[in-house]
């Protein structure tokens, strides 16, 4: 077991809880909880030496599994060998990435059969929003990777529509770059009372002017185009480790843009690219179609285009409940979120859908929600209970039939409670 970087604060507790390897963010290696403090704990009899031996065995097993060395059985020694190089960005890898992105897209809302768009009849398409032309694989902190390429939503749409459709793109909203303050939040978290900060949006007069101009441009074009897609959401100024969002509101004045564009063209499809929920109350009821795309990786733009154009039937389900507002979340309701950096998690296990169900709190979209372009019928549900002195089993089975006119996938979800 390996720790997160800078996450270990107590030596004995970490040693007794199964931690094998501590990672941190400072250069004072001897001061790490699992370094000299652990040695002293063993010498003082607070941690058993056998526990340390077990941790070493776990680390050596991993190194051996990764071919970092081989073992000379006769001499009982480790032998350094040349590690086998792997491969990356192969056609098979790209296909897996594309398929994963396809299956992750969630169709949240689709009134009047607004989606999919009819590709053959599409001659002009307006795409609005910075996230349409932005890539996100650089992650939000230590999630950063060096992707060899990434297909943006705009690029994916242009590729799949080819030369038969004119695709017009406008930014819609102004996204100013945040200035880093140089604080090492991971190192800061190791200090007493340290932790994450909060990210709040502030706009000056120049930003407000630019946003007004871009909003007016988006509204003007939205009234001229029959088919409009707004691609917004969050980015890694907000979806990032090391600091919390102050609320769930869309940044960069996007709510005002979406409202105005929907007023100009009620058929506008709204796509959210984000890794965490956002408030949708100002415009969700006005939108006929809402799609959630996540940060879908290198092939995310192609996958999104395939779903919007009906080449792929969406089958994704939400892995979490989307509240209407951050004030509906348990951490806020018990007063455990605010300016303080030290939190006590008084909500206990009642987080996410557990809290919403226990307190009967309505949500924007529930855990497991996700629509399809086709319809499925469930029948012949059977429930079998098996119980003995040691264990208790419940076997649930049913037959699922596609009753629509499109090929599709359906994920069967079973919910249980005591």
Annotate each PLM feature.
Residues 136-139, 232-251:
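Glycine/threonine-rich flexible loop motifs
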Residues 225:
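An anion/phosphate-binding loop that grips the pyrophosphate of nucleotide cofactors and donors
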Residues 218-221, 283:
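Structural alpha-helical scaffold elements that stabilize or flank donor/cofactor-binding regions
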Residues 158, 258-265:
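Surface-exposed amphipathic alpha-helices with a cationic face
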Residues 1, 10, 254-258, 268, ...:
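Extended, hydrophobic alpha-helical segments in both membrane/secreted and soluble proteins
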Residues 1-29:
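Short acidic/histidine-rich active-site segments
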Residues 12, 30, 40-41, 45-141, ...:
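Secreted, periplasmic, or luminal enzymes acting at the cell surface/secretory milieu
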């Amino acid at each position: 077991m390996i720790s997160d970087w800078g996450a270990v604060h107590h030596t004995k507790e970490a040693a007794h809880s199964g931690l094998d390897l501590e990672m941190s963010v400072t250069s004072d290696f001897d001061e790490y909880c699992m370094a000299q403090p652990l040695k002293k704990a063993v010498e003082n009899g607070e941690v058993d030496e056998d526990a340390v031996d077990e941790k070493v065995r776990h680390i050596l097993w991993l190194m051996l599994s990764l071919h970092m060395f081989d073992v000379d059985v006769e001499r009982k020694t480790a032998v350094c060998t040349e590690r086998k190089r792997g491969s990356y960005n192969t056609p098979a890898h790209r296909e897996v990435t594309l398929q994963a992105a396809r299956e992750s897209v969630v169709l949240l809302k689709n009134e009047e059969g607004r989606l999919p768009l009819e590709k053959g009849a599409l001659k002009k398409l307006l795409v609005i929003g910075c996230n349409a032309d932005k890539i996100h694989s650089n992650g939000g902190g230590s999630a950063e990777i060096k992707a060899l390429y990434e297909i943006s939503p705009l690029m994916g749409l242009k590729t799949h529509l080819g030369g038969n459709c004119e695709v017009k793109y406008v930014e819609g909203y102004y996204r100013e770059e945040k200035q880093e303050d140089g604080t090492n939040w991971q190192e800061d978290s190791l200090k007493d009372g340290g932790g994450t900060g909060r990210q709040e949006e502030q706009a000056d007069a120049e930003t407000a002017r630019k946003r007004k101009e871009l909003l007016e441009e988006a509204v003007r074009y939205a009234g001229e185009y029959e088919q409009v897609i707004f691609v917004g959401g969050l980015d890694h100024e907000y979806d990032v480790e090391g600091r919390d969002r102050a609320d769930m509101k869309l940044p960069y004045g996007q709510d005002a843009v979406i409202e105005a564009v929907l007023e100009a063209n009620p058929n506008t499809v709204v796509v959210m690219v984000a890794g965490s929920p956002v408030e949708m109350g100002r415009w969700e009821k006005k939108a006929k179609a809402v799609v959630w795309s996540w940060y879908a990786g290198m092939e995310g733009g192609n996958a999104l285009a395939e779903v919007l154009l009906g080449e792929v039937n969406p089958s994704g389900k939400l892995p979490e409940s989307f509240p209407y507002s951050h004030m509906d979340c348990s951490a806020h309701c018990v007063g455990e979120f605010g300016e303080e950096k030290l939190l006590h998690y008084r909500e206990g296990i009642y987080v996410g859908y557990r809290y919403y169900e226990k307190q009967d709190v309505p949500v924007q979209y529930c855990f497991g929600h996700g629509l399809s372009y086709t319809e499925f019928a469930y029948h012949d549900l059977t429930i079998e209970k098996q119980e003995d002195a040691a264990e208790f089993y419940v076997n649930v089975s049913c037959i699922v039939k596609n009753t629509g006119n499109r090929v599709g996938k359906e994920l069967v979800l079973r919910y249980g409670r005591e």
